[in-house]
Design a protein with these regions (language model features):
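Positively charged n-region of N-terminal signal peptides that target proteins for export
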Residues: 1-4
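Bacterial N-terminal signal peptides
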Residues: 7-17
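Bacterial Sec-dependent signal peptides at the C-terminal "C-region" and cleavage site
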Residues: 16-29
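Short, conserved loop/helix-junction motifs that constitute active-site signature segments
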Residues: 27-29, 99, 138-140
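Active-site segments of SGNH/GDSL-like serine hydrolases
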Residues: 107-113, 133-169
Length: 175
């Protein structure tokens, strides 16, 4: 129930952001290509049918045929280049770049709260994020990049303990 609520909330926030992002200018070149870049949350891990229940699939359903929404999620991916599984070293990253999207939705950072990552590389988070955004803008200078806030975490998830919750809040405060 809680997971489904957060997915619906996430979809609503994406849809609202997209509708306010000036995509009317993009409609001249239909379909508008949307790349959903992220980790297991984007990928749809844990869902009964990720092909229809992941947020990129739901976003495609909401936006309709004028959009081509693709899922470039990689479970365990980190934004940090020196993280334990950097997104930029995954095939999904190469595929997302090749897609040359008009809109890129980035939902990365939750795995960066891992004790192997955040304590050691937190100072590189913003520069690594900017580098990722710049890469997509070099491929398509007119693309719009939307950054999703981190999915809320709870004490019920065994991985998110003690300092990890604090690091999660630090990442969410980055602007």
């Amino acid at each position: 129930m809680t997971r489904r609520f957060f997915i619906i909330l996430l979809l609503f926030s994406y849809f609202f952001t997209l509708s306010c992002a000036g995509v009317e200018n993009l409609k001249a070149s239909l379909p508008i290509k949307v790349a959903c870049v992220g980790n297991s949350i984007t990928y749809g891990s844990g869902l009964a049918n990720r092909e229809t229940e992941s947020y990129p699939a739901r976003l495609q359903e909401m936006l309709g045929n004028d959009y081509d929404v693709r899922n470039f999620g990689r479970p365990g991916a980190t934004l940090l280049r020196k993280g334990h599984r950097p997104y930029i070293q995954q095939k999904e990253y190469a595929n997302a770049k090749a897609f040359a999207a008009d809109i890129v939705v980035i939902h990365l950072g939750i795995n960066d709260t891992d004790p192997r990552n955040w304590p050691n590389y937190r100072d590189e988070f913003i520069s690594d994020y900017r580098a990722l955004i710049d890469t997509f803008r070099m491929i398509n200078p007119k693309c719009r990049v939307l950054i999703a806030r981190l999915t809320p975490i709870t004490i019920l998830h065994p991985r998110f303990e003690s300092g990890t919750r604090d690091w999660h809040d630090e990442i969410n405060e980055v602007e």
